[in-house]
């Protein structure tokens, strides 16, 4: 600010020392424009120098001539003069200037939409490349696709799902120029299956959460049933699992009370004497090893939860992840 004030004061003193003193309005104007920016201050100083150069004749010149003199002195003779817009040299360098701008009629496809100039098109959320993109223009009809489309075969839903998954993987690996009408139909069936899977609710839905292993088997062509259609274990296996914990429960019954033991002391004594008379080898052969007992104990511990899991397979659904279902 100090340098600006000093420059303004210096220019004002230089102007005041000229032939004609500035009036109050010109002084305010000079102060205002000089305080805008350093470039504006430099321009005002140059104008005052031009005015001092002409002296008292400057006041007698018309305003248009004053502006012309200022422009000529500020720009300088070495600056190139503006060219005529119809100059032949400019037209050769910029051929777009030859035709009239803003009068080109643009038509939008087959629809009845026209507008002038490519810059005055109606607003659209899609770009021009997105609007002009089409798969049918890039597709090449293959003979195998034509035969497959002409001979439709009834397929099960599982095989349709496997074909849809195969077609989706094939479309990722193959290029766009191999697409055909059958590929579009397969992709449509794939999205239809996905929609049915996401819409299915309850244990009676056709497509329920498939695990990754089931998806892989569908890709291989194997038929995979959802959890609601899985066969339950045979009744014999279930009866065997039921009998095993029942026998264990019978073994774990409480001992008879003291009154019955007092009434029948003879069989207990006979059984204990028979045990003492038996050979240790026979006892080792009859009694199971501690490892076998431990295994039997573990089987008894885990047998009932397994039965509960089998019985509730229709109610509790799979999570959809192998590491959660099979750990």
From Swiss-Prot:
It comes from the Eukaryota. InterPro entries: DUF4706. It is found in: Cytoplasm. The lineage of its organism: Eukaryota, Metazoa, Chordata, Craniata, Vertebrata. The modification N-acetylalanine is found at residue 2. This is Uncharacterized protein C1orf198. The modification Phosphoserine is found at residues 37, 129, 175, 289. GO terms for cellular component: cytosol. PANTHER family: SIMILAR TO RIKEN CDNA 2310022B05. Keywords: Acetylation, Cytoplasm, Phosphoprotein. Residues 134-148 have a biased composition (Polar residues). Residues 1-17, 162-176 have a biased composition (Low complexity). Residues 1-22, 76-113, 134-299 are annotated as: Disordered.
């Amino acid at each position: 600010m100090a340098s600006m004030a000093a420059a303004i004061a210096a220019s004002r003193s230089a102007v005041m020392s000229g032939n004609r003193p500035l009036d109050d309005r010109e002084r305010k104007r000079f102060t205002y424009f000089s305080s805008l920016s350093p470039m504006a201050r430099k321009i005002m100083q140059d104008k005052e120098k031009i005015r001092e150069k002409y002296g008292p004749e400057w006041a007698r010149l018309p305003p248009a001539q004053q502006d012309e003199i200022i422009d000529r002195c500020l720009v300088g003779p070495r600056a190139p003069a503006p060219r005529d817009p119809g100059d032949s040299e400019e037209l050769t360098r910029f051929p777009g200037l030859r035709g009239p701008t803003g009068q080109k009629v643009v038509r939008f496809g087959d629809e009845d939409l026209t507008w002038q100039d490519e810059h005055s098109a109606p607003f659209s959320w899609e770009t021009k490349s997105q609007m002009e993109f089409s798969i049918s223009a890039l597709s090449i009809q293959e003979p195998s696709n034509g035969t497959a489309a002409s001979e439709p075969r009834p397929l099960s839903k599982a095989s349709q799902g496997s074909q849809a998954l195969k077609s989706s993987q094939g479309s990722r690996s193959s290029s766009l120029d191999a697409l055909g009408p059958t590929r579009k139909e397969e992709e449509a069936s794939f999205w239809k299956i996905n929609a049915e899977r996401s819409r299915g609710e309850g244990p009676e839905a056709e497509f329920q959460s498939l695990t990754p292993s089931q998806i892989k088997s569908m890709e291989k062509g194997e038929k995979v049933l959802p959890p609601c259609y899985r066969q339950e274990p045979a009744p014999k296996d279930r009866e065997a699992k039921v009998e095993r914990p029942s026998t264990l429960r019978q073994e774990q019954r409480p001992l008879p009370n003291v009154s019955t033991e007092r009434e029948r002391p003879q069989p207990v004594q006979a059984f204990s004497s028979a045990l003492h008379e038996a050979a240790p080898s026979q006892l080792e052969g009859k009694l199971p090893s501690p490892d076998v007992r431990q295994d039997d104990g573990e089987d008894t511990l885990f047998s009932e939860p397994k039965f509960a899991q089998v019985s509730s397979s229709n109610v509790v659904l799979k999570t959809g992840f192998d590491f959660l279902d099979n750990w």
